[in-house]
Design a protein with these regions (language model features):
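Active-site/acyl-donor-binding loops of N-acyltransferases
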Residues: 146-165, 244, 294, 299-337
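A mid-sequence, solvent-exposed acidic-amphipathic segment
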Residues: 219, 226-247, 251-252, 257
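Short amphipathic alpha-helix that is part of the acyltransferase structural core
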Residues: 2-54, 67-69, 74, 175-224
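Short alpha-helical
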Residues: 27, 137-138, 313-314
Length: 337
């Protein structure tokens, strides 16, 4: 008789009676999306199909990705552990545990967290990074009791594009343009370029982004993404809204930019807004955002969302002037192993 236990069998043995661990399935996305959507603002709601699309574009790597079925066969919980979107040189891993609200307070979370941490220690990871959201009742308290400490907050906010009026900030845009800075869309820039020049533009944009990225007050130092990943997700994915991605040019030099991605059918998301170190304090970021919101409105979007790290008071202040409304914070967590 074969008495060999699989990894999921081992996890199942730690779960309450009737619950069963198994490998993650593609069909798990629907119930997880429904569960999350029930707890967040309607503008933050996503779809299982979008989740699939992004993972097809950039397949994640996991050391552990399991789901737990309830006695009735419905999805009850899950856990993940892997190097994350941008792997860290020191071997830090990103992990998480989720339990459906209907199945909490039964020990599922503790059992799965133990599995995650054992796997991370086996990989000799120095720490686990994770996150939760202030909208998820009790989640921060649960994590804190288990040794995870809050290391930062990322503030998501939105503005109703249809109601946006850029007139009060027209003078800022005028001053920037009068200084010799050209504000234009990526769509316009690409129309001016042949394939070779287009390829060079994307590489120039990525290079210009690097010092801006380094200056973001991340809760945990985050390496600038490789050009191949940038190209795959920004250039080749078809997700960027070129008509609402604005670049500030000083001659041929990229002084600043704000990039917009499509989310759902009628929302845009600011992926990055950055200003070169030599150009700060001149109103470029404000001018870019004014142009962005006007372009988003013309493109038929009803709302724009963005995320800023809590210490980034300058950018958050600009967004407040533009009418952005804050949503519950994403809370960054860390546990040293």
């Amino acid at each position: 008789m074969d008495t060999t236990m699989t990894a999921t069998d081992t996890i199942t043995a730690t779960l309450p009676s009737g619950y069963r661990a198994r490998e993650f399935r593609d069909s798990d996305r629907e119930p997880w999306t429904e569960e999350r959507n029930a707890q967040v603002h309607e503008l933050q709601r996503g779809t299982a199909e979008e989740w699939r699309e992004w993972e097809q574009i950039d397949p994640p790597k996991f050391r552990l990705r399991v789901s737990v079925d309830a006695p009735d066969g419905s999805l009850a919980a899950g856990a993940e552990l892997g190097p994350g979107f941008l792997p860290r040189e020191d071997g830090t891993l990103f992990g998480g545990v989720n339990v459906m609200r209907a199945h909490r307070r039964k020990g599922l979370g503790d059992a799965l967290l133990k599995t995650v941490e054992l796997e991370a220690r086996a990989a000799k990871a120095p720490r686990i990074l994770s996150n939760t959201n202030a909208a998820f009742a009790g989640s921060l308290e649960w994590a804190t009791k288990r040794g995870y400490k809050e290391i930062g907050r990322r503030i998501e906010s939105y503005v109703d594009v249809r109601a946006f009026d850029g007139a009060p900030l027209r003078d800022v845009v005028g001053r920037v343009e009068a200084s010799g800075i050209r504000l234009t869309t990526v769509a316009e820039l690409l129309r001016e370029r042949d394939p070779a020049a287009t390829a060079q533009f994307w590489h120039d944009l990525w290079e210009a982004e690097a010092p801006m990225w380094d200056d973001v007050p991340w809760a945990s130092p985050t390496p600038h993404w490789p050009f191949e990943k940038f190209k795959k997700l920004v250039v080749d994915s078809g997700k960027m809204v070129n008509e609402a991605t604005i670049v500030a040019l000083d001659g041929e030099r990229i002084a600043a930019f704000t990039s917009t991605g499509k989310q759902g059918t009628d929302r845009g998301y600011t992926w990055m807004t950055g200003t070169g170190r030599d150009y700060r304090g001149r109103g470029l970021a404000t001018a870019l955002k004014v142009k962005l919101l006007a372009a988003a409105k013309a493109a038929g979007l009803r709302a724009m969302l963005t995320t800023n790290d809590e210490p980034n008071k300058a950018m958050r202040g600009i967004n407040a002037k533009l009418g952005y409304v804050m949503l519950p914070a994403n809370i960054e967590l860390e546990k040293t192993l």
